């Protein structure tokens, strides 16, 4: 039942540095150590917020050339909200897709005018979190289990993983681009906290529908169509 409603991202990699971090992380969990040191992974509650703050500062230093993209379920942490506000004031373009609770008001002149917030609620309950800092060759991309909430950053064990593979980054950028183009389920947050439906474009584009079509096309390439009942059920979904 859950699998029919929820979507998320997972990552399988042979990257040695990430593997070493993951091994150390689970060893630390086994002995109750929440203060481990990790080189590639972002790990809460001990260091994730500090490292995210440093990544935002990295973009602030670029001024108007800086860029941040965040896909989250929620953002409520005051420290990170303040840091994103600082980024906006420095001219950094901050693009956020926040499905649920969002405690930062975008497009407030002199404060958050460079922040744009969109919410997409559709057939599937999306749980993927994506963080991108910078663009093109300078981009640092992460997938994560953590929202920008105090409970995630300070009171839970959470992990963010860097994405180095060009092929995987391309797939994630495909998700981001489709959600940018969504004009059927997307709602844009205004400076007063209300939401307005996105109506750009002449043709209706639903990000979730497009991604489902991508998945079906990939399945057709990797496995030929069959008469098995499970395949027919999948086609009817």
Regions found by a protein language model. Give the residues of each.
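PLD/PLD-like phosphodiesterase catalytic module centered on the HKD motif
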Residues: 1-19, 29-36, 42-237
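Core active-site phosphate/anionic-ligand binding loop and the adjoining beta-turn-alpha structural block
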Residues: 22
């Amino acid at each position: 039942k859950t699998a029919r409603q929820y979507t998320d991202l997972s990552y399988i990699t042979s990257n040695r540095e990430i593997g070493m971090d993951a091994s150390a992380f689970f060893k630390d969990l086994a002995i109750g150590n929440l203060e481990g040191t990790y080189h590639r992974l972002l790990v809460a509650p001990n260091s994730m917020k500090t490292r995210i703050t440093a990544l935002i500062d990295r973009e602030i230093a670029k001024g108007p050339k800086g860029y941040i993209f965040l896909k989250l379920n929620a953002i409520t942490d005051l420290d990170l909200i303040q840091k994103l506000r600082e980024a906006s004031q420095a001219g950094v373009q901050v693009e956020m897709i926040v499905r649920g609770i969002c405690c930062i008001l975008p497009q407030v002149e002199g404060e958050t005018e460079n922040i744009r917030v969109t919410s997409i609620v559709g057939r599937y309950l999306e749980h993927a979190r994506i963080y991108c800092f910078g663009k093109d060759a300078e981009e640092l991309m992460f997938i994560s289990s953590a929202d920008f909430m105090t409970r995630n950053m300070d009171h839970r064990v959470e992990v963010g993983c860097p994405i180095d593979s060009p092929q995987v980054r391309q797939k994630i950028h495909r998700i981001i681009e489709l959600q940018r183009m969504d004009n059927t389920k997307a709602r844009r947050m205004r400076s007063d906290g209300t939401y307005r439906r996105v109506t750009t474009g002449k043709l209706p584009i639903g990000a979730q529908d497009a991604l489902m079509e991508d998945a079906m096309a990939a399945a057709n390439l990797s496995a030929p169509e069959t008469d098995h009942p499970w395949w027919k059920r999948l086609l009817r979904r």
